[in-house]
């Protein structure tokens, strides 16, 4: 096999390679075996025409296209390996020469992985995130727990306020005409939740049980139902009930109701502080990693990202997003209907971050190569075990679903991320701001 690579653009080139006569013979033989099964030749049973008869009637060249399809994948793989290139898209293959008895000469226009010129990735400067927990944060967290323990009780003789839950019937219309989704009975609405059209909830504040209220609103210009965008609407609303939150007393009994492992309110505060501290430490670690990796990406030079790589990233993101929705019981059709969007709009939305995601992967792969990161068998086995536990699968099933090379690649990328993160230098926010 001889392969020749000629660069014709930033990330594109022409790969010329040969298919030897031995491989051609194998391909032609296989092509004949497939073709003869479909042939009806007088004097022979279907599928049993001798090779020499076929060649005399049709010529061996009639098998060349099928033979090419058979031998091309292996020949192309060998050629890109010999040329030392990494394609990122399907090639455009042309036949340069296909003479009987000689090696076939093929060429392919190939888009390749862009070159990465690494900048500084060790010892990058990042902002040190505070993990200090204030008493105010503890009090706010305790108050959230209190809110979670609150009970809704009927509010009698007093008007609705922000935070109250009202049970209502509503019937909406635009220019006197009803519209889909504009009518409901006995609907529980939390005032101030902003779950309805802007202005709707505000107009119920100050009204009492059994009141009829006319609510006038304007649909936002970006409302999901295009036929309602920017339209004025009138909702006839009947208030059936008003309920308000009744918060529990902030005492030891409340603390024990919230957490059976504590004996007092003070114990709950101590434990809450520890929980907040733990979250902040994790958040600070995540922020350090994100900022350090982004710095390494920003410091690197990549001339141009091939369109094929951007499209592949968007495809992967869309599939993952819709798969996550599916796990929540929401089909793609239902999701697009609920959001009033389309797959094209979702693709446009996810494409915004595609370039940085692809750049990040390219830089991390370049660091893996520069640092000669080569995960051990034990590291790969540990990753398979983690994946099996994460997805509730047998390790054997994980190995079947994912190639070992793919898993090894992911482990290497994680190691590159750890290298960047661990070597990053944290600076106080005030010092970083002065630069």
UniProtKB/Swiss-Prot annotation:
A GO molecular function held by the record: peptidyl-prolyl cis-trans isomerase activity
EC numbers on record: 5.2.1.8
Chain ranges of the PPIase FKBP-type domain: 163-248
Keyword Lipid biosynthesis part of the UniProt annotation: no
Catalytic activity: [protein]-peptidylproline (omega=180) = [protein]-peptidylproline (omega=0)
Sorted UniProt keywords: Cell cycle, Cell division, Chaperone, Cytoplasm, Isomerase, Rotamase
Gene Ontology cellular component terms for the protein in this record: cytoplasm
GO biological-process terms attached to the record: 'de novo' cotranslational protein folding; cell division; chaperone-mediated protein folding; protein transport; protein unfolding
InterPro entries referenced in this protein's UniProt entry, alphabetically: PPIase_dom_sf, PPIase_FKBP_dom, Trig_fac, Trigger_fac_C, Trigger_fac_C_sf, Trigger_fac_ribosome-bd_bac, Trigger_fac_ribosome-bd_sf, Trigger_fact/SurA_dom_sf
Subcellular location per the Swiss-Prot or TrEMBL entry: Cytoplasm
Domain of life from the UniProt record: Bacteria
Keyword Protein transport annotated: no
Matches recorded under NCBIfam families: tig
Cited function: Involved in protein export. Acts as a chaperone by maintaining the newly synthesized protein in an open conformation. Functions as a peptidyl-prolyl cis-trans isomerase.
Family, as annotated: Belongs to the FKBP-type PPIase family. Tig subfamily.
Notes concerning its domains: Consists of 3 domains; the N-terminus binds the ribosome, the middle domain has PPIase activity, while the C-terminus has intrinsic chaperone activity on its own.
Protein name: Trigger factor
Protein source organism: Pediococcus pentosaceus (strain ATCC 25745 / CCUG 21536 / LMG 10740 / 183-1w)
